[in-house]
Amino acid sequence: MGEPQRPLAVSLGDPAGIGPEIIVHAWRMRDSANLAPFAVAGGANVLRSATEALGVPCPIQEIDDIAEANSAFLEALPVIKGLDGAYLPGAPDPIGAKLALKSLEMATRLATAGHASGVVTAPIAKGLLEQVGFTHPGQTEFLAAACGLPEDASVMMLAGPSLRAVPLTVHCPLAEVPGLLSIGLIVERGRIVASALQRDFGIERPRLAVTGLNPHAGEDGKFGNEEQDVIAPAIAELLADGITATGPHPADALFSPHSRAGFDAALCMYHDQALIPVKALDFDQGVNVTLGLPIVRTSPDHGTAFDIAGRGTAHPGAMVFALLMAGECAARRADA
């Protein structure tokens, strides 16, 4: 019999947001959702307070070592000692942001050191993190840097039960997208996506569908030349590499049930082109997966939701799916 899988490390997220409560709910769903064991990087007091506010049973067990999580997980939510703070739902401040950052750093260290099988990150508020010294555009770029990679070496994929989609450009003004797209960018990220679908998702021959940038995928240059000058040559290069890739597809027709059956992931030209269909189809189960890292990382595809924090109305589905996906990806890597 092989060794048990190492636990996942879960960051607390901003303690004023919905992170603590969706973590509590996820632990309570551990059996029905068949979740792998996980431990939270600090915040025992925050999680106890969240449990009390929710009025649900969730015993908290503080542990010294994440290895203890496997045995503790069945009976209690394991929380690693060393970090804590106050639970003030809906009242974000720099103190809470600093706790969120320290928790993210701890969870990441556990994964990069090989003690955790992967990282699942709860939502943060980037503006507040910047006030306490966070210098990265987001958690994705932070994790790449923590793994010793350039910030642009990782790829963000949004995934749910119905669709996987990758925005090739992310947090930038829409007006800048045409200038940011290049054959090299599309090819490099297409290779990362294809490799990750094989390694982490068990898809032997991944099929990539590549969108156009312009309406009707440019309609032979009538509405723009990016499809002819950039996107089609990139697809040809991916095909030459042995990667199954089709397109450029008009984005408005790509996400129907019939079309989705023909590909494993969509490469989209900009943020909303990828995120709108994922959130429309799988809003309560959408997961942000970071591809191209030596560690597994997932996150629920939603924000801190300060406006509903502490009310008991936050849906835990995306956190549950993020934990489930991280556990499955980690298991595939362990078996490889």
Swiss-Prot record:
Its EC number is 1.1.1.262. Pfam families: PdxA. The keyword NAD applies. A divalent metal cation binds at residues 171, 216, 271. GO terms for biological process: pyridoxal phosphate biosynthetic process; pyridoxine biosynthetic process. Pathway: Cofactor biosynthesis; pyridoxine 5'-phosphate biosynthesis; pyridoxine 5'-phosphate from D-erythrose 4-phosphate: step 4/5. GO terms for molecular function: 4-hydroxythreonine-4-phosphate dehydrogenase activity; cobalt ion binding; magnesium ion binding; NAD binding; zinc ion binding. It catalyses: 4-(phosphooxy)-L-threonine + NAD(+) = 3-amino-2-oxopropyl phosphate + CO2 + NADH. GO terms for cellular component: cytoplasm. Binds 1 divalent metal cation per subunit. Can use ions such as Zn(2+), Mg(2+) or Co(2+). The keyword Cytoplasm applies. Keywords: Cobalt, Cytoplasm, Magnesium, Metal-binding, NAD, NADP, Oxidoreductase, Pyridoxine biosynthesis, Zinc. Substrate binds at residues 140, 279, 288, 297. It is found in: Cytoplasm. InterPro entries: PdxA, PdxA_fam. Its cofactor is Zn(2+); Mg(2+); Co(2+). It is an enzyme of class 1 (oxidoreductase). NCBIfam families: pdxA, PRK05312.1. Belongs to the PdxA family. Catalyzes the NAD(P)-dependent oxidation of 4-(phosphooxy)-L-threonine (HTP) into 2-amino-3-oxo-4-(phosphooxy)butyric acid which spontaneously decarboxylates to form 3-amino-2-oxopropyl phosphate (AHAP). The active site is located at the dimer interface. Homodimer. This is 4-hydroxythreonine-4-phosphate dehydrogenase.
